[in-house]
């Protein structure tokens, strides 16, 4: 930390807790207080993590290239492109200046949203291997249950979470791609907070438009319209049957229409969708990989 910020730790912080409050494979987080009296969270990369990831990513790249060479039937999955997408994401994740910039951008996007907050970045105490943000005084979202909050507040929290997710994806095209419960917090007023901005995704305007039309089509149970959007977006080979594809979509949509989200198996749904991509020889859409991963995690939350 001192080497990265080129200052003694007792000059950077009036108080610094040596015991990490959170730890993961890439970094750990410490609670601290600045000389100005601000409570902050300090994220520090683990020593040697860059070299360790470089080895793992080289192996993943080699495996993807081998699959494309030796398994023609799997080339539609674009394994090399998929791995390159992951590599770009990891490279950004290993530079905490990029993570700080992502937090800053997300905070700016939701500056007018009173029920959602993103911690402020302390740029004077942030570098490639260290990031300092304001402290979020809130409880982990897993602690929020019908036993701990009243029904109205619980509804508000769920509505805020859903609204924030869809605004990120459909309005801004810039979304938090690691929205698991460990990164979600709720304060005593029901305000939702996000932390850990190392994995972020982006969607261009066309992809946002197509995604919104697909979601609306499913809500309206207009499977022909959903099929047409898939063809317009180039998600399905043009020689495929549009009617058969609409029929396949109906087989996915109708069984879950009107069900509570808790009664829908995300795993079974994904398995069925994957069968459809195989049946219609649909290539992997690498720009959507992070979104697909995020939607699986959000469904779990």
Where are these regions (language model features)?
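Conserved catalytic cores of large enzyme domains
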Residues: 1-301
């Amino acid at each position: 930390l001192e080497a990265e910020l080129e200052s003694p730790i007792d000059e950077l912080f009036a108080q610094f807790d040596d015991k990490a409050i959170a730890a993961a494979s890439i970094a750990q987080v410490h609670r601290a207080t600045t000389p100005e009296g601000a409570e902050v969270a300090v994220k520090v990369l683990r020593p040697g993590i860059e070299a360790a990831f470089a080895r793992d990513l080289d192996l993943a790249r080699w495996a993807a290239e081998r699959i494309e060479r030796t398994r023609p039937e799997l080339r539609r999955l674009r394994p090399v492109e998929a791995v390159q997408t992951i590599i770009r994401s990891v490279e950004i994740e290993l530079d905490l200046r990029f993570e700080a910039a992502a937090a800053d951008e997300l905070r700016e996007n939701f500056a007018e949203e009173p029920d959602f907050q993103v911690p402020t970045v302390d740029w004077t105490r942030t570098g490639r291997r260290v990031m300092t943000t304001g402290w979020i005084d809130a409880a982990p979202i897993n602690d929020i249950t019908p036993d701990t909050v009243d029904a109205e507040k619980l509804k508000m929290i769920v509505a805020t979470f859903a609204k924030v997710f869809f605004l990120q994806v459909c309005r801004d095209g810039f979304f938090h791609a690691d929205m698991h419960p460990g990164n979600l917090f709720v304060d005593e007023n029901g305000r939702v907070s996000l932390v850990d901005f190392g994995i972020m995704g982006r969607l261009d305007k066309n992809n946002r438009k197509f995604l919104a039309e697909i979601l609306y089509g499913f809500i309206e149970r207009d499977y022909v319209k959903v099929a047409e959007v898939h063809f317009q977006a180039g998600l399905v080979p043009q020689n495929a049957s549009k009617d058969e594809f609409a029929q396949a979509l109906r087989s996915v949509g109708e069984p879950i229409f009107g069900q509570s989200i808790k009664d829908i198996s995300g795993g079974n749904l994904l398995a069925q969708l994957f069968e459809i991509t195989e049946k219609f020889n649909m290539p992997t859409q690498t720009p959507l990989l992070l979104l697909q991963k995020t939607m699986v995690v959000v469904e779990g939350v």
